[in-house]
Design a protein with these regions (language model features):
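Flexible "cap/lid" subdomain of the alpha/beta-hydrolase fold that forms the substrate-access gate
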Residues: 2-15, 19-25, 34, 62, ...
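Catalytic histidine-centered segment of alpha/beta-hydrolase-like enzymes
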Residues: 272-285
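ASCE P-loop NTPase motor core, strongest for the SF2 helicase catalytic module
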Residues: 48-49, 101, 284
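A short, glycine- and basic residue-enriched loop/turn
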Residues: 44-45, 110, 272-273
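Short amphipathic alpha-helical segment that frequently serves as the phosphate-/nucleotide-binding helix
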Residues: 42, 255, 285
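Conserved HGGG/HGGXW glycine-rich cap/lid loop of the alpha/beta-hydrolase fold
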Residues: 27-71
Length: 296
């Protein structure tokens, strides 16, 4: 697919009422299977902008902004993972998605795994990268020791609030550091826009505190263990992308997990950290399109 074709692709922005708030989403494509794109922290549907155009000629694509992110509403809620589940479930019911392929990264994978564990009959396939999984100890989290210390600080009362809410550290430092290329001023402006105030950044703060590490938080850890068990038992097609060295998922970890999944294809993207969509959008998009061809 050429750059001109990508630029000519029509991504339509829509908005629906969900649980007393609103959720914004990108939509493209009119024929083929439903494909749901789920982003992570602190991004939005914007991160799929150069991937969806590869897929939309053969699929109906939907990329929501999670509640509290992007152009979606910011209701007065705790923004725990359970809240994200409630709003995503209601969003999918509102727009009428039933059977679907899910493409996910970061916290989008935790949402995808949890949805697939509860509704396996609705899953046509699952493509994912840099995924959330239960980590028995901090050595299992991230490829860089300094990142582990940083996320410990995010989870520390007072320190996390100062760094993420007041200093906007996740947007200004974590995001650009986890992309191999330099994000443009326009791209950074798009990612900054949803979070102009400390209060607006609460959703960003809550996700690091929900990471299932060393048995905590207990409810999240138990849920993620159950969801991983369901994922290993499932036989729907899977497509696992990984970068080198990766962030949450190294090439070695990706290979190990893939060997424990049924019907899982591995795709090596080359140099990359966490936000692989920003470094390899066209490779990811083309691979998803070819994979969906095999599904249908």
């Amino acid at each position: 697919m050429t750059l001109q074709t990508i630029q000519e692709s029509k991504l339509t922005r829509r908005e629906v009422e969900v649980l007393g708030s609103t959720m914004s989403y990108l939509q493209a494509g009119t024929e083929g299977p439903n494909v749901l794109f789920l982003h992570g922290n602190p991004t939005s549907s914007y991160i799929w902008r150069d991937i969806i155009p590869h897929v939309e000629p053969q699929a109906k694509c939907f990329a929501p902004d999670l509640i509290g992110f992007g152009r979606s509403g910011k209701p007065d809620i705790d923004y725990r993972f359970a809240d994200q589940v409630r709003y995503l479930d209601a969003f999918l019911e509102t727009i009428g998605l039933n059977k679907m392929v899910i493409v996910a990264q970061d916290w989008g994978t935790a949402l995808a795994f949890h949805y697939a564990a509860r509704f396996p009959e609705k899953i046509l396939g699952l493509a994912f990268m840099e995924f959330i999984h239960p980590m028995p100890n901090w050595d299992n989290f991230h490829q860089r020791p300094e990142a582990r210390e940083l996320f410990k600080a995010f989870r520390t009362p007072g320190m996390g609030e100062k760094m993420i809410l007041e200093d906007n550290f996740f947007i200004e430092r974590v995001l650009p550091a986890a992309v191999t290329r330099k994000l443009s001023d326009a791209e950074m402006a798009e990612y900054r826009a949803p979070f102009p105030t400390p209060q607006s950044r609460k959703p960003i703060l809550m996700f690091p505190r929900e990471l299932p590490i060393a048995g905590e938080p207990r409810d999240m850890y138990a849920m993620c263990e159950d969801d991983q068990a369901a994922l290993r038992a499932s036989n729907y097609p899977k497509l696992l992308f990984y970068g080198d060295p990766g962030a949450l998922i190294s090439p070695e970890v990706a290979t190990r997990f893939a060997s424990g999944f049924q019907n899982c294809q591995l795709v090596r993207l080359g140099t990359g950290s966490h936000y692989l969509q920003e470094d390899h959008p066209h490779t990811i998009g083309a691979a998803i399109r070819q994979w969906i061809d095999l599904l249908i």
